[in-house]
Structures are given as C-alpha cells and as structure tokens.
Amino acid sequence: MKKPFRIGFGFDVHRLSEGYPLWMGGVRLEHSKGLEGHSDADVLIHAICDALLGAAALRDIGYHFPPSDPQYKGIDSKILLARAMELVRSQGYELGNIDATIAAEQPKLNPHIPDMQRVLAEVIQVEVSDISLKATTTEKLGFTGREEGISAYAVALLIAAV
C-alpha cells in the first residue's frame, strides 16, 4: 500500500571560486565568485533534488545524474530539478511543500528569495507558497564563514497523488 506522505532531506555544498557564475535557486546572482561543480553548481537546487528523490526512495542526484557522465557537464540545474520531479511523479507522488535553507556569508541572499521561489515553483509546477526558502550565515565559522563555499539544506514533503 502506498504511503500517503513521504519526507526527504537533501544537502549540498560547493566551493566558491573566481571565474564561475553564481547560480542559486535557478537565479544568476552578481558576485565576485561563483560555485565550482560539474553542472552549474546550484547548491539550492541540488539539495532540493536530493530531498525530492530521497522522499520517493529514489536515491540521490549523483545516482540519476552522475558527474562522471559528460552529458551533465555544465547543465542547467533547473533541468535536473524538472527531471527529478518527473521521477517523483512517476512513483505516484506530488509535492506537498519544500522548506530549504542556504548558508552563505556573501552575497546577501534575502533580496533574491522571491525570484528563486518563483523560478523553482515554475520548474516544479507548483504554487510559490509551496516553496519556503531561508538564508542564513554561519557567523563567520567554518568553510562557509570563511567564504570558501556555500551549503544548502532542504526538506521535501510528498503527498500520494489521487
């Protein structure tokens, strides 16, 4: 019997480096550094993908879209998010909601949250109110505090489709 609700958790981190664009939640942000990665390194979308896939017991983003596969080199993470949501829907689930937190000292992300919510909701095909995003710092502690990288955490609630 299919469970009526499933919850998944996702986490991702990428190194900040000069010479890369900074993508966050599908929105390109102006900053002196960007995130390194095989794809566009959008840590927020990657954490959300892992939360969605985990909730549906479909493993993780690296399993479905491995960095060893050249077709994913430089890919727009919004494409990965759309595919992850297709996989979730193929299992008979719809999104209840997402709650995610981004940890970064710079740039300040709060002004960009409404744009990120709109982009993510459009890609996943849900209401903006189904996407909760928060930004925090680590009070200058650890690799995020030293501005060496950015991390993101996400929880997704799935609801059995009727």
From Swiss-Prot:
It catalyses: 4-CDP-2-C-methyl-D-erythritol 2-phosphate = 2-C-methyl-D-erythritol 2,4-cyclic diphosphate + CMP. Keywords: Isoprene biosynthesis, Lyase, Metal-binding. Pathway: Isoprenoid biosynthesis; isopentenyl diphosphate biosynthesis via DXP pathway; isopentenyl diphosphate from 1-deoxy-D-xylulose 5-phosphate: step 4/6. PROSITE patterns: ISPF. The keyword Metal-binding applies. Binds 1 divalent metal cation per subunit. The keyword Metal-binding applies. One of its GO terms (molecular function) is 2-C-methyl-D-erythritol 2,4-cyclodiphosphate synthase activity. The record marks H38, T137 as: Transition state stabilizer. It comes from the Bacteria. It is an enzyme of class 4 (lyase). A divalent metal cation binds at D12, H14, H46. Belongs to the IspF family. Homotrimer. Involved in the biosynthesis of isopentenyl diphosphate (IPP) and dimethylallyl diphosphate (DMAPP), two major building blocks of isoprenoid compounds. Catalyzes the conversion of 4-diphosphocytidyl-2-C-methyl-D-erythritol 2-phosphate (CDP-ME2P) to 2-C-methyl-D-erythritol 2,4-cyclodiphosphate (ME-CPP) with a corresponding release of cytidine 5-monophosphate (CMP). This is 2-C-methyl-D-erythritol 2,4-cyclodiphosphate synthase.
